[in-house]
């Protein structure tokens, strides 16, 4: 019998109920797995669990995007990497929606375990992995500054309230130099976004043509500071992808280096969590072929290589 460990965050979202874990366990067992559920108790616990457990055939993350980030982080610290999967139970669930999951945990388990294993690129910022997005500047502190109890009580509305507050505050520019695709550019930027996803902050089709296995990621550098320009840009994101919005400098690359002129006070946001690394220089690159079991639904549009990994 195959072995599976489910690492779940008991504080994620509204839908994860401890009294239903036995139902999820029985469902996973129907797919031929001997399964163990482990609940996280503190930030970083999921990473510790995955980095230290013995070999298993599958590790499932059951939580928000941040929980999946920790699972991936822990896996990259192992000598022998494991096959991972993600069942979304968070607030925004950008990764889960991108993968093709819905809102029902039971249905998502079925979609996952009847899916395919794909080799997926994972980005690293100063050797710290992020699954789908890292950002700095305007609006980028909202995900980690919004209190957890408000996220759980109000869901996505909690982020919108934080966004409204941030919108009304003064927009700061950061003096940075970045190197990308053989170019070296200096300027003042209000926010920067590095991603490998077609859904970010609840915006579907943030980019129209994204592949998760092409050894590239997308970069946006924004010079906007006026509120009217920010409103126009957000409006265009509803009808057009971010690569075609005026005032946003867009690149697709496999390597990026960003240097701040002065030490930034705020932290980067990686997959909705605060990046604890504080320095003036950040280097972003790819870690290739991390094995992820996911639903078949969106594989054809998310991956260049259509052959099964296993």
Question: What is the predicted function of each stretch?
Answer:
Residues 135, 193-206, 274:
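Glycine-rich phosphate/pyrophosphate-binding beta-alpha loops
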Residues 17, 180, 211, 221-310:
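ATP/nucleoside-binding phosphotransfer catalytic cores, i.e., glycine-rich phosphate-binding loops
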Residues 30-31, 38-40, 77-190, 194:
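Catalytic core of DAGKc-family lipid kinases
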Residues 150-158, 208-228:
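Gly/Ser/Thr-rich active-site loops/lids in small-molecule metabolic enzymes
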Residues 1-4, 82, 254:
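Nucleotide donor/acceptor-binding cores
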Residues 67-79:
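Short Gly/Thr/Asp-enriched flexible loops that form oxyanion-binding sites at enzyme active sites
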Residues 1-62, 74, 107, 308-310:
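ATP/NTP phosphate-donor binding region
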